[in-house]
């Protein structure tokens, strides 16, 4: 290889990557967006650096620039250097390499894990084909050798039935499994630098802990450096050696993790830390409480502020009607999915939800928490009728919905609405915001076409958006704004029950706080009842009156929030608590020994019926499923 063509730079020996005064811009029709505006930092061998900030701060564009992927999305590196110490011991300025040379760098020297695995995986190739392609290209292995490495990587990231998964396609896996596939693919060639762009945002806490453990283990074994892009300060505290805080494309603060968390200098850093939901912040509180809002308008405004107000936890009003009959009563709900093999033969049933029961009072929030694949989303879809349950009863206002036909269900559908995890996927891209919100109003004949406009504008105002958003399309909105549209659409029919399925899991802390606070305000105003499905224990603790913990399709513990968080009994509940990252680097957990846990398959033979085990009552509203070595704690 001709060294004269490699743009070789002198660099500190221990530094894997050195970024100098990087500026990245996007040219729009009428203006230039300065996405990254003069950022500098370095990443040393074996070091983990976290780039933190809210949506739009420039952290993801910084990561994409290191891979030179901004070239494909309209971005342009206008100045600066990205110097890499390659595996072949060349010092390369990546800003000057062409895309052909960058293809040799990507996957081999630098790998990247993206936030959205479904858009990163090729839908027409199997998981095995996609992982082995990278291994064959960069390591020169045979197909058989590459397949063996791929199988080992799938096992490392704890995907159940690994041999089967390698022959499946991305759409056949859950979101959590797809993300683990992306991680396996990124680590398969043992890169010098792993860039992880929000890799655990949509994963539950135990899988998140396992992935963080896995990355740390590989980092130790091969001396890999890691660049974490995240808004989750708990993850930052758990993994980062150094932290770079970004706002409006600029670096506003840099320091060790302990310096940033214990003695943040910049007002924006202090406000970012204040907005982090903290597990245990509700001890002694009986009712849900709002989050602290982080209101950011400009970097200059932050520079001029000397103090950031950190409000104390303020409880909401008691909205629960405990004297009336339950609004929702679920009895023995069971949902199974038939899995077909070759030539349409029945291969077994997935026992997604297995014999669960609970009630919801008017004005109450029940938090349903558990790992990916535990059945919590299927529970919500089965209740509202998007998925047909196998058996069981769902009583809404005393009427068993499972016995109603489609025509009879119409009057109940408008009383129950759902907010989905991915607002972009659940909003029609061809419709304006006004049309999206007006659609259910028109379908149910609640307003004439002309009258619906004013109703839509009132709904927009109620979720914190003004009239200018009426004519916009979903792609013109931020993630937080799209989720507000989803809430406005859910409110359009004046429902009594809203099922929120991971409604805030992909939002950064400030937007998450705004959306959750809005939902609690609406509960106070309209007496709404929520089934709040989430894997985020800190959010669940903040919003819920009662909590149900799901594992392998069953509710294993249910009770008042204080009972679950202050006196958990089931081992799985305790495991969930232990896996939550704490936003304090001095309290980093040691390895949780979760990597060797086997994930039992939910696929059961045709005709299999599990033994029914009744829950044990521990106290008022507190129930637990019996478990091996059961010894209850006071």
Model-derived features with residue positions:
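Conserved ABC ATPase signature
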Residues: 168-173, 177, 473-477, 481
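Conserved ABC ATPase "signature" region
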Residues: 85, 145-164, 399-400, 451-468, ...
């Amino acid at each position: 290889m001709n060294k004269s063509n490699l743009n070789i730079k002198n660099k500190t020996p221990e530094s894997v990557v050195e970024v100098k005064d990087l500026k990245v811009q996007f040219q729009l029709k009428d203006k230039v967006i300065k996405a990254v505006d003069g950022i500098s930092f370095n990443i040393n061998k074996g070091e983990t650096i976290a780039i933190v900030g809210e949506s739009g701060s420039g952290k993801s564009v910084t990561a994409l620039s290191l891979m030179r992927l901004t070239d494909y999305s309209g971005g342009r590196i206008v100045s600066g250097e990205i110097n890499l110490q390659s595996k072949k011991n060349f010092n390369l300025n990546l800003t000057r390499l062409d895309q052909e040379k960058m293809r040799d760098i990507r996957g081999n020297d630098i790998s990247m894990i993206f936030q959205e695995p479904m858009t990163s995986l090729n839908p027409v190739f199997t998981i095995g084909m996609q992982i082995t392609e990278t291994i064959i290209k960069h390591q020169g292995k045979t197909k058989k050798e590459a397949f063996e490495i791929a199988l080992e990587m799938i096992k490392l990231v704890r995907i159940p039935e690994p041999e089967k998964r390698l022959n499946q396609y991305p759409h056949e896996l859950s979101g959590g499994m797809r993300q683990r596939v992306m991680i396996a693919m990124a680590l398969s060639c043992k890169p010098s630098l792993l860039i992880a762009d929000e890799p655990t945002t949509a994963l539950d806490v135990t899988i998140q802990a396992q992935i963080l453990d896995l990355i740390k283990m590989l980092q130790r074994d091969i001396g890999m450096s890691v660049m974490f892009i995240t808004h989750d300060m708990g993850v930052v505290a758990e993994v980062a050696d150094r932290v770079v805080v970004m706002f409006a494309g600029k670096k506003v603060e840099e320091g060790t993790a302990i310096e940033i968390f214990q003695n943040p200098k910049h007002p924006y850093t202090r406000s970012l830390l204040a907005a982090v939901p903290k597990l245990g912040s509700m001890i002694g509180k009986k009712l849900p409480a709002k989050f602290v809002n982080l209101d950011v308008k400009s970097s200059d405004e932050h520079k001029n502020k000397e103090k950031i107000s950190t409000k104390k936890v303020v409880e909401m009003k008691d909205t629960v009607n405990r004297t009336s009959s339950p609004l929702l009563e679920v009895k023995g709900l069971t949902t199974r999915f038939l899995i077909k093999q070759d030539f349409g033969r029945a291969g077994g049933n997935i026992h997604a939800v297995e014999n669960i029961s609970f009630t919801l009072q008017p004005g109450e929030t029940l938090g349903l928490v558990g790992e990916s694949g535990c059945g919590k989303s299927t529970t919500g879809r089965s209740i509202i009728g998007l998925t047909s349950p196998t058996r069981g009863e769902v009583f809404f206002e005393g009427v068993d919905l499972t016995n109603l036909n489609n025509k009879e269900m119409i009057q109940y559908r408008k009383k129950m609405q759902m907010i989905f995890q991915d607002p972009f996927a659940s909003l029609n891209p061809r419709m304006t915001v006004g049309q999206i919100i007006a659609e259910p109003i028109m379908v149910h004949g609640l307003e004439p076409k002309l009258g619906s406009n004013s109703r839509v504008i009132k709904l927009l105002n109620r979720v914190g958006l003004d009239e200018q958003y009426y004519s916009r399309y979903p792609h013109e909105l931020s993630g937080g704004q799209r989720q507000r549209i989803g809430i406005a659409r859910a409110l359009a029919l004046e429902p009594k029950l809203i099922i929120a399925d991971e409604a805030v899991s992909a939002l950064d802390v400030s937007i998450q706080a705004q959306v959750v606070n809005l939902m609690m305000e609406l509960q106070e105003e309209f007496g709404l009842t929520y089934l709040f499905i989430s894997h985020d224990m800190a959010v669940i603790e903040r919003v819920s009156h009662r909590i149900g913990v799901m594992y392998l399709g069953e509710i294993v513990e249910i009770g008042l929030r204080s009972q679950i968080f202050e006196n958990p009994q089931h081992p799985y509940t305790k495991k969930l608590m232990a896996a939550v990252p704490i936003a304090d680097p001095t309290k980093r957990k040691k390895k949780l020994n979760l990597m060797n846990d086997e994930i039992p398959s939910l696929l059961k033979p045709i005709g299999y019926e599990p033994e029914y085990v009744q829950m044990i009552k521990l106290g008022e509203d507190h129930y637990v499923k019996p478990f091996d070595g059961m010894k209850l704690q006071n």
